[in-house]
A protein has these predicted regions:
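Phosphate-backbone binding interfaces of nucleic-acid-interacting proteins
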Residues: 2-131
Length: 131
């Protein structure tokens, strides 16, 4: 059995949980998938945006933009498997269509915002649906 690793989160603040409930049918419309990061690059003229080229297991490369450059350098993410919601309507940012949203965990620690892109085991294939 592997030991359980614990971190000290006593200095961490998290956002309160939404009080408004979402019915199951609305939630079930959200399509969360494992996506393999094929390429990642900084978006010119943007301090925050990274452009991800992703394998979503179904079609040609999917492009998603995410404002996480403050937390990650592009090269450290290539080859990783992340989680995305893939059935959002395309949204144009900096002239580029973003076809979904990568999922991150956000918290505040010692007065600074922290962000972690949700990544899963690389043995999970691109396109695997999350329930």
């Amino acid at each position: 059995m592997l030991p359980v690793l614990r971190s000290d989160f006593s200095n961490v603040k998290i956002e309160p949980i939404f009080e408004e409930m979402v019915d199951f049918d609305t939630f079930a419309k959200s399509d969360f998938r494992a996506v393999k990061i094929l390429a990642c690059e900084a978006v010119p003229k943007s301090k925050k945006l990274l452009k991800f080229t992703l394998d979503d297991g179904e079609r040609k490369d999917r492009v998603i933009l995410s404002g996480i450059h403050e937390y990650y350098e592009p090269e450290e993410l290539v080859g990783k498997t992340a989680i995305a919601i893939v059935n959002l309507p395309p949204r144009k940012m900096m002239g580029i269509d973003s076809e979904g949203m990568l999922i991150s965990a956000v918290h505040e620690e010692d007065g600074h915002e922290g962000l972690n892109l949700l990544m899963v085991n690389d043995r999970i294939p691109a396109g695997a649906k999350l329930y």
